[in-house]
Each structure stands twice: as C-alpha cells, then as structure tokens.
Amino acid sequence: MMRTIPEKDWKHMRSMKSRVLNEACARILADVEAIVQKRDGRNHETYLTLWNLLKTKDAEIASMFDNFKRSTALFKLAAWYRYGLVSKSELTSFTEETQSTLKAINETLR
C-alpha cells in the first residue's frame, strides 16, 4: 500500500475539498432542521439532541478536513467515500494506485 497520494491525485482532491465540505455541512444542517422542526415544545430535549448531533458531526468533519495535507490525504479521501460524500464513479477519476489503496483502507476499516 502506498504511503502518500500521487501529486496528480492530490491536486484533484484539493480541487474537490470545498465542494465536499459544503456537501457535508449541508447534510448536517438538514439534520439540524429536521430535529428543530420536530421539537413540539420539547425545547430542552431538542437542544440536547442538537448538542449531541453537533459534537458527533464536528468530530466527523474534523477527521475529514482538519490537518488536510498530502501525507493524510488517502485517509481523508477514504473517509469522504465512507461517509458517502464521494461516489464510486468519482473515485475512478483517481489513479489506479490510489483506488487500490482506498479499497485496502476501507476493507481494513470494515
């Protein structure tokens, strides 16, 4: 398994970062909206639910986007795929070497 992502794939991944982060945040905000709409007078319970959701989602966002550098890129890309932010067809735009490494990472994490 390779240790760093090829330069071509790193450039491609960096070009995707903003879109993928925006999509991840949009999904979180949709979850927030759904929780708030169902609060039915249970404001404190709703607040606690939101607090727990945002703590969990913040950790996910951090794992996918914090410390974003070439040496961590393969694990970030694997997380994008695992969380459904990058499709299988989008992964085909990466080199075979990167695709093979991503497959190995995701199989290990199952």
Question: Could you tell me what each predicted segment is?
Answer:
Residues 1-110:
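Acidic, Ser/Pro/Thr-rich low-complexity regulatory regions
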